[in-house]
């Protein structure tokens, strides 16, 4: 797929630094290690490579898996879903539809969410921008 944001892998490597392996090589950060896992403020989550808007804080929930989880993207066109048969299992990879960077995986395992989906994202693949009037909230208030 051709993405609106096009850069050479050398350019990505220079720009992304320690984020490169996750965003461009589909690595996975260690569970419970991401800075955004416990982010409780209202705001917007964007692609850590290109800034494309991906998820609203109101769709974030605690799945207990060790990575930030969301039940839907800001719109269906914000992300690209691809079959991933690595590691001896079939999963659905989630990429940024604007630059093709790897974000994580989506699983249809429910958790009682409105969509029945769990977008399991790498914190290092996301940027968080709090709303101007944002204060910490409980997960049920988001």
Segment roles from a protein language model:
Residues 3-142:
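A short Gly-Trp-Pro
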């Amino acid at each position: 797929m051709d993405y609106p944001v096009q850069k050479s892998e050398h350019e990505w490597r220079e720009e992304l630094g320690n984020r490169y392996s996750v965003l461009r090589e589909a690595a996975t950060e260690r569970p419970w290690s991401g800075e955004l896992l416990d982010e409780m403020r209202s705001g917007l989550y964007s692609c850590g490579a290109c800034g494309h808007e991906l998820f609203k804080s109101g769709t974030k929930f605690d799945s207990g898996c060790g990575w930030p989880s969301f039940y839907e993207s800001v719109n269906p066109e914000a992300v690209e879903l691809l079959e991933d048969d690595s590691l001896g299992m079939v999963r659905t990879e989630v990429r940024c539809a604007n630059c093709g960077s790897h974000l994580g995986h989506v699983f249809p395992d429910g958790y009682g969410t409105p969509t029945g989906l769990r977008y399991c994202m790498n914190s290092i693949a996301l940027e968080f921008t709090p709303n101007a009037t944002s204060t910490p909230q409980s997960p049920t208030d988001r």
